[in-house]
Amino acid sequence: MTRIESTFETLKAQNKKALIPYVMAGDPSPNSFVDLLHDLVKHGADMIEVGLPFSDPMADGPTVALAGERALAGGTSTHQALAIVKKFREQDSSTPIILMGYLNPIEIIGYEAFIALCHESGVDGVLVVDLPPAESGNFVERLAAHDINKIFLLSPTTLPERRKQVMTHCGGYIYYVSLKGVTGSASLDTQAVGEQVQAIKQETNLPICVGFGIRDGQSAAAIGQYADGVIVGSELVKNFSGLSHTSRAEDIATAQASIMTKMDELRQALDALSA
């Protein structure tokens, strides 16, 4: 059983929903990022999605795209992102870490080398936005050999054939994209999302986690009624806007504190569902 699978099993036994924050590796500074990961866990994260900085992030909205630019400007590469995860693992051996990124940086490193680095660093899941499930079989198998889950996206516009392929190849959990568009998009129709999640649950036993458009405790709780977990990215990442790797430690700490305040709100809202 992988660390992701074990975490969801524990949450299910406790009748709890997974809170999964998304942060960009090395944003705003690689020096503060390990502390950020530990703080997210202290403030209720059940697992963490870590973005891999990339120069052409087609699915990222402006907030997350700017986070990637800040990380790249600070020198955070895919190799350094993995080194950060490895550093995090020195003190935390239980919180699952999922890498979310694009295919190009992985191909530059090489599939085998990338998977070996993930295993060595303690990565639990990989979500490659632009790797079609139909072309992922070999990659999925090689990840699985190291107890790493391959996560896939489903959205309101996913065609039936692709949906079937996702069900076949996905492990850990399914990331359901609640909105058409890019990360940080606006309105969230919780009833429509709920209907979609319930329909997906008829087709798979995998946990369903919903991301895109969750901004506060109210929207997290509304989605948490249907989903097994919620993923929150832009609402957290936006706190680092205007900062960089050259910013004062005090300014980064202030932004990080704002993120933790939001985490507390989200955690309390989700826990209230099982109270």
From Swiss-Prot:
SUPFAM superfamilies: Ribulose-phoshate binding barrel. Pathway: Amino-acid biosynthesis; L-tryptophan biosynthesis; L-tryptophan from chorismate: step 5/5. It comes from Psychrobacter sp. (strain PRwf-1). The lineage of its organism: Bacteria, Pseudomonadati, Pseudomonadota, Gammaproteobacteria, Moraxellales. The active site is at E49 (proton acceptor), D60 (proton acceptor). NCBIfam families: trpA. The alpha subunit is responsible for the aldol cleavage of indoleglycerol phosphate to indole and glyceraldehyde 3-phosphate. One of its GO terms (cellular component) is cytosol. Tetramer of two alpha and two beta chains. Gene3D superfamilies: Aldolase class I (3.20.20.70). This is Tryptophan synthase alpha chain. Belongs to the TrpA family. It holds the Pfam family Trp_syntA. It catalyses: (1S,2R)-1-C-(indol-3-yl)glycerol 3-phosphate + L-serine = D-glyceraldehyde 3-phosphate + L-tryptophan + H2O. Its EC number is 4.2.1.20. HAMAP family: Trp_synth_alpha. GO terms for molecular function: tryptophan synthase activity. InterPro entries: Aldolase_TIM, RibuloseP-bd_barrel, Trp_synthase_alpha_AS, Trp_synthase_suA. It is an enzyme of class 4 (lyase). Keywords: Amino-acid biosynthesis, Aromatic amino acid biosynthesis, Lyase, Tryptophan biosynthesis. Transmembrane segments: none annotated. It comes from the Bacteria.
